[in-house]
Amino acid sequence: LMREIPGMVVINPSDDVEARAAVHAAYDHVGPVYLRFGRLAVPVINDREDYKFEIGKGIVLKEGTDVTIFATGLEVSESLEAAKMLEKDAISAEVINIRTIKPIDEELVVASATKTKKVVTVEEHSVIGGLGSAVAEVLCEKAPTKMMRIGVNDRFGESGPAVELIHKYELDAEGICKIIQQVQRRLSYRRIWQSFFA
């Protein structure tokens, strides 16, 4: 919803370090800014000395070659954990923190999608209108790519402990890993069948 408002900047920090930096960036920005914060305490992932927050810029947290995971907010730490799990299946996942959903870092989205040829977005938000939609819009126009959105599907949200809800909607590391493994298997089977009949 906020992404549709003209001139609105939408920021979704991934940890407390980024949240603090985002507040400073919002204060310095001329124009409206919507800061979105998750309820869960998350590990600090932005503790490097060279860390810098810039509106409209994402950051590559882990290099990969098989699939790109674009994540935002508390799903960034879950996606990093999922990427570690995927390594056990020999799946190399690139993890990118999209801290600004609007304006989105189009250059980074296109570069990573072009590199890995497969994209997954992860957000603790509806798959409609959020990060998944923003990434899909960029790729549709600039770099058509196989893509899957992980988030809350077209349904009303529920109340409850945040940890339980994250697990229920498969937005934890295990759920993200499982979904990506399933997609990777389907694509592998398709390649095998295509080569068999070639």
Residue positions per predicted region:
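Conserved thiamine diphosphate
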Residues: 1-28
